[in-house]
Swiss-Prot record:
Gene name of the encoded protein: Fth1
Gene3D superfamilies: 1.20.1260.10
Gene source species: Rattus norvegicus (Rat)
Coiled-coil zones: none
Name assigned to this protein: Ferritin heavy chain
EC numbers, comma separated: 1.16.3.1
Length: 182
């Protein structure tokens, strides 16, 4: 492994922050990978919930964009990107829409906790640029995602999922599909 050359643009950017950004990049890519797995599961012919598939594919793209935004920040601040292996999702069979939404909720809470820890590190290292970046691009979006997923879990449960297959079909069609006829 070659050592990265020192940056001429680096200023007030602590090595701990740089390392934490690299870990966050990996976590965002892992989240993207999990959502991609969920999307493919719901797109299977024996599951056939196309709006669950679309929803999770959209989430996958969002998480990848989060990782790319962090990579751009790393380069702007004079840090160096060191990519790690992306962990395989814990499962391939997501069982039901309700289970996938519960797993997604847990995942988003984990990502949010990691971002909060990154923000605390930036505060401790007196890095207002990093604090502002996290606040502007991530924290509010995470709270909205967690609320949306929590609502989806509640609504699926109220409709009788996972015992009622009709509940997931109707949720797929009318909530995730926004009532579309396609």
């Amino acid at each position: 492994m070659t050592t990265a050359s020192p940056s001429q643009v680096r200023q007030n950017y602590h090595q701990d922050s740089e390392a934490a950004i690299n870990r966050q990049i990996n976590l965002e890519l892992y989240a993207s990978y999990v959502y991609l797995s969920m999307s493919c599961y719901f797109d299977r012919d024996d599951v056939a919930l196309k709006n669950f598939a679309k929803y999770f594919l959209h989430q996958s793209h969002e998480e990848r964009e989060h990782a790319e935004k962090l990579m751009k920040l790393q380069n702007q601040r004079g840090g160096r990107i060191f990519l790690q292996d992306i962990k395989k999702p814990d499962r391939d069979d997501w069982e039901s829409g309700l289970n996938a939404m519960r797993c997604a909720l847990h995942l988003e809470k984990s990502v949010n906790q990691s971002l909060l820890e990154l923000h605390k590190l930036a505060t401790d290292k007196n890095d207002p640029h990093l604090c502002d970046f996290i606040e502007t691009h991530y924290l509010n979006e995470q709270v909205k995602s967690i609320k949306e997923l929590g609502d989806h879990v509640t609504n699926l449960r109220k409709m009788g999922a996972p015992e009622s297959g009709m509940a997931e079909y109707l949720f797929d069609k009318h909530t995730l599909g926004h009532g579309d006829e396609s």
